[in-house]
A protein has these predicted regions:
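Flexible, surface-exposed loop/linker segments and immediately adjacent secondary-structure boundaries
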Residues: 1-137
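Structural boundary/hinge residues at secondary-structure and domain interfaces
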Residues: 138-216
Length: 216
């Protein structure tokens, strides 16, 4: 059991898994250090140095936060992501789900496969390379690949053309200045749903993700 303010460190070539009371799991790379605090908003992981991968459990009304000490805060309610903190700043990478990253008063939403840094001097690298040290790297890489393929396929779904005329226009009140006609999205939604269900049935990583989403 961890007491408030207890610091957890890993030595050179060491590795550790820490399970929180809410079910979240923190995987630590060697030469990493963090401590925990908790308040009415949720639990905060204060990452002093090193790299971690967090499998955040569903948080309900609270959130799980990561404070990197350089003015950057990451907020999640249930997702898988990594944070790498060093002297130049931090790099946040999302494996699954989405995180809200607040740095210097500016908030950004990151989703699976995306990455952000707190300084322009920090190089961006592929997410799969960022978490290659993890004991679960192969599974994470499979998840990233599955979502990347799914997003590409969904991006190819034909979008309806712009509607610039409609029989309803004649029914508009006299004097109407602006009329906006939305395209019919039914076929697009149906096709996207079909593709998602098909890929979920075919891919174990997507099935695992879908099962977690459905249970939440």
């Amino acid at each position: 059991k961890l007491d408030k303010g207890d610091r957890i460190r890993t030595a050179k070539d060491a590795h550790a898994f820490v399970r929180l009371g809410d079910g979240s799991v923190i995987e630590m790379k060697d030469r990493s250090e963090f401590y925990l605090t908790k308040n009415s908003l949720g639990t905060t992981i204060h990452l002093n140095r090193g790299a971690i991968v967090v499998e955040a459990a569903k948080q309900g009304k609270q959130h799980l936060f990561v404070d990197t000490g350089d003015g950057s805060h990451v907020s999640v309610t249930g997702t898988v992501f990594s944070v790498n903190s060093g002297t130049k700043g931090s790099r946040v990478s999302v494996i699954e789900g989405e995180v809200h990253m607040d740095h210097a008063g500016s908030e950004r939403v990151l989703r699976g496969g995306e990455q952000a840094t707190t300084s322009a001097s920090i190089e961006r690298i592929p997410v799969k390379d960022e978490i290659s040290w993890s004991r679960k790297a192969a599974r994470y890489a499979e998840t990233l690949s599955a979502f990347n393929s799914l997003n590409k396929e969904l991006g190819k779904v034909a979008q309806p053309g712009v509607r610039n005329s409609t029989h309803l226009l004649d029914l508009m009140p006299e004097g109407t200045i602006v009329y906006a006609a939305l395209p019919n999205l039914t076929s697009t939604i149906v096709e996207s749903h079909r593709i998602m269900q098909e890929r979920i049935n075919q891919n174990a990583a997507l099935r695992e993700w879908w099962a977690k989403e459905a249970s939440g």
